[in-house]
Design a protein with these regions (language model features):
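Short, T/G/N/S-enriched strand-turn elements that build extracellular solenoid repeat scaffolds
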Residues: 6, 30-32, 130
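C-terminal/domain-terminus segments
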Residues: 108-137, 141
Length: 174
């Protein structure tokens, strides 16, 4: 068993394909469903649980960060404490629903739940929950639109024109 499987037990046995370099804070708070993919240079700060359901894709250079800090300046200022240091960090879990795709250089902030079959655009910063079947983009990320059957058919047409084989799941069959 490799170091990664020791840190993240759910990464073995088909749980995830993870490309190096991969950075995490603890590893033990990261939970992968089956068939997840994590591209290179991703950072998972797992002070609280990070859960990726089945089939989640994570693009290159994505940050998934559960830590949070006080909003007010005087609460963050360590010089005000006698020891010169005070750790006011806390963490909130992150949950990403099955079939979602987090595109390159996106950031997912603590406390966020991303629904099933969502697309988070490249460079987006997700600070709020995302409903199922949505595309979000921007800083902060906002819902652009819902995904529907027409989107599924467009993907199907693209695959057929390029003669790319699709799995039964991608065709929407059981």
């Amino acid at each position: 068993t490799g170091l990664l499987e020791k840190l993240i037990p759910s990464a073995k046995d088909g749980g995830a394909a993870i490309f190096a370099p991969f950075y995490c804070e603890y590893g033990v708070n990261i939970h992968f469903g089956k068939g997840c993919f994590v591209n290179y240079k991703c950072t998972f700060l797992d002070c609280a649980p990070i859960t990726l359901e089945d089939g989640v894709w994570v693009g290159a250079n994505v940050t998934i960060a559960t830590p949070c800090h006080p909003f007010l300046f005087d609460e963050r200022l360590p010089q005000q404490y006698p020891d010169g240091f005070h750790d006011l960090e806390y963490a909130k879990p992150i949950h990403i629903g099955s079939g979602s795709w987090i595109c390159s250089s996106a950031t997912i902030c603590g406390g966020v739940t991303i629904g099933k079959n969502c697309i988070v655009a490249a460079g987006a910063v997700v600070t709020r929950d995302v409903p199922d079947n949505c595309i979000v983009a921007g800083v902060p990320a906002k819902v652009l639109r819902k995904l529907d059957e027409q989107d599924r058919m467009q993907v199907w047409d693209t695959y057929m024109k390029n003669e790319v084989p699709m799995s039964e799941r991608e065709r929407g069959r059981k």
